[in-house]
């Protein structure tokens, strides 16, 4: 049956989620297939996606903790069952979900005797805890216990040099990897010149995002990585003249929008990516840092939201407006935009 589906060489490449489950609050699983692929393509896609899923997706972690009147991280605190080192390890395991950029502050301030869990962390509005039952420490006596925390969004495994912090602040080796594991396998089918491959992709995440969301973000990161190669450099133009110039994808915003306008249901704004807009590299990078990936994301923001983005200036706002006004129906702009 599968052989009949992929035998035709003219079939469109399609992907599908064939299994999705939640094993626990901190363990999500998803299984996907992509087909039909020509011989060798499944391995190429599988390797690229696996590396992007494990290394290119950002996560939010606790990166620093500040204790009061603690001489070193191996100290014990009277009235607390765990040592400072054990508390730091427990904080390292806390799974957070957010879209923040930069460093944010959080804190814990409780009175014993009681168990301290992730639910006791006082977080900024843009951050939430995936599993509030994660343990931190056990207060065995009626003492006041306070910790100042630092939260940061990053990617990969981040380490800091151990220093003698006089203020009681200790770095935490953060693992900013929402994807816990990725496996892929390849199934070949067909005969002779019509032989094709099916890619099976398995993704496990820590609950801060779903496997489907992780696959989407990894795919977008790969697309962004290859964007510079979609435009050949003009003959006789030096690299220095082109290094700061943004190069849009092959399908321009105008062409995509023209096709979308033919849809009677209206324009699917979540199908237009900001990569397809005629934006400067600086404006484009500002929007990407703020997790604005599609036109729907952009139109959902107010002017105040945009102006709060790091390095976003008034000229960026004007440039975005001019671009949208040029290509979008004016009634859509009036309904969607508040700036």
Curated annotation (Swiss-Prot):
Identify the stretch(es) annotated as Alpha C-terminal domain (alpha-CTD): 264-339
Q: Where is this region: Alpha N-terminal domain (alpha-NTD)?
A: 1-233
Mainly localized where?
plastid
Q: Which GO terms describe its molecular function?
A: DNA binding; DNA-directed RNA polymerase activity; protein dimerization activity
Q: Could you tell me where this protein is found in the cell?
A: Plastid, Chloroplast
Q: Which domain of life is it from?
A: Eukaryota
| Record carries keyword Protease | no
Q: List, alphabetically, the GO terms of the cellular component aspect.
A: chloroplast; DNA-directed RNA polymerase complex; mitochondrion
Under the heading Pfam families, the entry gives:
RNA_pol_A_bac, RNA_pol_A_CTD, RNA_pol_L
Which Cys pairs does UniProt list as disulfide-bonded? Answer: none
Reactions catalysed: RNA(n) + a ribonucleoside 5'-triphosphate = RNA(n+1) + diphosphate
Provide the alphabetized UniProt keywords. Answer: Chloroplast, DNA-directed RNA polymerase, Nucleotidyltransferase, Plastid, Transcription, Transferase
Its Enzyme Commission number(s) read: 2.7.7.6
Entry-linked NCBIfam families? rpoA
Quaternary arrangement and interactors, per the entry? In plastids the minimal PEP RNA polymerase catalytic core is composed of four subunits: alpha, beta, beta', and beta''. When a (nuclear-encoded) sigma factor is associated with the core the holoenzyme is formed, which can initiate transcription.
The record's note on its domains:
The N-terminal domain is essential for RNAP assembly and basal transcription, whereas the C-terminal domain is involved in interaction with transcriptional regulators and with upstream promoter elements.
Q: What job does the chain carry out?
A: DNA-dependent RNA polymerase catalyzes the transcription of DNA into RNA using the four ribonucleoside triphosphates as substrates.
Protein name according to UniProt? DNA-directed RNA polymerase subunit alpha
* Organism name: Elymus californicus (California bottlebrush grass)
């Amino acid at each position: 049956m599968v052989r009949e589906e992929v035998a035709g060489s003219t079939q469109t490449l399609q992907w599908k989620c064939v299994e999705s489950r939640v094993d626990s609050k901190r363990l999500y699983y998803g299984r996907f297939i992509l087909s039909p692929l020509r011989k060798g393509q499944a391995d190429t896609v599988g390797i690229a996606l696996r590396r992007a899923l494990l290394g290119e997706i950002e996560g939010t972690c606790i990166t620093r903790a500040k204790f009061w009147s603690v001489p070193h991280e191996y100290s014990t605190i009277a009235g607390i069952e765990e040592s400072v080192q054990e508390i730091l390890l427990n904080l390292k395991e806390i799974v957070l979900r957010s879209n923040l950029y930069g460093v944010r502050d959080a804190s814990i301030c409780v009175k014993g005797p009681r168990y301290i869990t992730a639910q006791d962390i006082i977080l900024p509005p843009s951050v939430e805890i995936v599993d509030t039952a994660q343990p931190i420490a056990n207060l065995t006596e009626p003492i006041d216990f306070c910790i100042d925390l630092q939260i940061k969004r990053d990617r990969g495994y981040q380490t800091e040099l151990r220093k003698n912090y006089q203020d009681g602040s200790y770095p935490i080796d953060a693992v900013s990897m929402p994807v816990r594991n990725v496996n892929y396998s390849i199934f070949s089918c067909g005969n002779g010149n019509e032989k094709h491959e099916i890619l099976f992709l398995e993704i496990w995440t820590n609950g801060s995002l779903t496997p489907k969301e992780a696959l989407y973000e990894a795919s977008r990161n790969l697309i962004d990585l290859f964007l510079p190669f979609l435009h050949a450099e003009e003959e006789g133009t030096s690299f220095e003249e082109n290094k700061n110039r943004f190069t849009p994808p092959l399908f321009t915003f105008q062409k995509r929008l023209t096709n979308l306008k033919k849809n009677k249901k209206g324009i699917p704004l979540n199908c237009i990516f900001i990569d397809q807009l005629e934006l400067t590299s600086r404006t484009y990078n500002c929007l990407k840092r703020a997790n604005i990936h599609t036109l729907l994301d952009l139109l959902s923001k107010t002017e105040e939201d945009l102006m709060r983005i790091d390095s976003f200036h008034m000229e960026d706002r004007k440039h975005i407006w001019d671009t949208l006004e040029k290509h979008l129906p004016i009634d859509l702009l009036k309904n969607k935009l508040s700036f």
